[in-house]
A protein has these predicted regions:
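A short, conserved, highly charged catalytic patch centered on acidic carboxylates
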Residues: 1-95, 103-159
C-alpha cells in the first residue's frame, strides 16, 4: 500500500488521476471535461487541472502532496492558490484543491481575500481515510472519487 516515502509523481499522481477520471465518468462530465497532468502556467507546473474540452478553460486546479502536514501547510496552500492567480483568462471557475489523497481542502480564489484560510470552503479539511484503512489502491481511488464527485459537483453548481 502507499506510504509517505513513495514518489509523489510515480505513485500519488496516478492514483489521483484515476480518481479524477472516474469522477468525471460518475458525474457524466467526461465529454465536457478532461483531466490534464502537469500543465504549465508560465514557468509553474500544476499537478492536475480539469479542463473544459470546448473552451480549454480550467474548472479547477488540483495540487498533490505526500503528507497530511503538507495539506495543512500555508506554504503549499499558497502554492496552489498561485496557480489560480496565474491562470487569469484561463479559468472557468476559480477553484483549487490541495490533497495528499488521505486529506483534502477545497478553496475558492478571491482576490479580495489574500490569505488562503479566507478562501477555504466548508467543511475545511476533508478526511478521505488513512492509507492503512484501505485494502488496496483501488479502494483508496474509490474513496477519493467520492470526495472529488461531491467537490466537483459543488464547483459545477457555482454560477
Amino acid at each position: 500500500m502507499i506510504n509517505y516515502n513513495d514518489s509523489e509523481v510515480g505513485v500519488y499522481h496516478p492514483i489521483c488521476e484515476n480518481a479524477l477520471n472516474k469522477t468525471l465518468r460518475l458525474l457524466g462530465q467526461e465529454r465536457n471535461y478532461r483531466v490534464l497532468h502537469h500543465r504549465y502556467t508560465g514557468s509553474l507546473e500544476m499537478d492536475f487541472v480539469i479542463e473544459n474540452i470546448t473552451t480549454h478553460k480550467y474548472l479547477c486546479v488540483i495540487e498533490v502532496k505526500r503528507t497530511p502536514a503538507a495539506v495543512n501547510s500555508t506554504r503549499y496552500q499558497f502554492q496552489a492558490m498561485s496557480y489560480v492567480q496565474s491562470n487569469v483568462g484561463l479559468t472557468e471557475k476559480p477553484y483549487y484543491i490541495l490533497t495528499n489523497l488521505e486529506r483534502a481542502i477545497l478553496f475558492r480564489y478571491d482576490s479580495a481575500r489574500q490569505r488562503t484560510y479566507q478562501q477555504m470552503l466548508q467543511p475545511g479539511l476533508s478526511i478521505i481515510g488513512d492509507f492503512q484503512s484501505f485494502a488496496d489502491e483501488n479502494a483508496l481511488c474509490d474513496a477519493l472519487s467520492i470526495y472529488f464527485k461531491d467537490t466537483i459537483n459543488t464547483i459545477l453548481a457555482d454560477d
